[in-house]
Amino acid sequence: SADEQKLRERFEALDKDKSGTLSVDELYEGVHAVHPKVSRNDIVKIIEKVDTNKDGQVSWQEFIEAFKRLADLKL
């Protein structure tokens, strides 16, 4: 879908080291730039909830889930 393509582009833009996963820092920098009220701790909490394989990184599938959770935050 068009929405998924936009999310994929956003994911790839945030993935600064092109590892295929997002670190806390990569996700925080990207989200904080758009939503300054989001704290690093907010990002850590979201990653803890969506990081299904517990590697401390956010994969593409985990990113989709994280994005849904971010959309639910009162920003």
Swiss-Prot record:
PROSITE patterns: EF_HAND_1 (PS00018), EF_HAND_2 (PS50222)
Binding site for Ca(2+) 2: D51, N53, D55, Q57, E62
Domain EF-hand: 2-37, 38-73
Residues modified as N-acetylserine: S1
Known tissue expression: Liver, and to a much lower level intestine.
Signal sequence bounds: none
A Pfam family: EF-hand_7
Gene Ontology molecular function: calcium ion binding
UniProt entry keywords in alphabetical sequence: Acetylation, Calcium, Copper, Metal-binding, Repeat
UniProt xrefs under InterPro entries: EF-hand-dom_pair (IPR011992), EF_Hand_1_Ca_BS (IPR018247), EF_hand_dom (IPR002048)
Positions that bind Ca(2+) 1: D15, D17, S19, T21, E26
Function in brief: Binds both calcium and copper, but not zinc. May be involved in calcium signal transduction.
Subunit structure comment from the entry: Monomer and homodimer.
Protein name according to UniProt: Calhepatin
Origin species: Lepidosiren paradoxus (South American lungfish)
Taxonomic lineage from the root: Eukaryota, Metazoa, Chordata, Craniata, Vertebrata
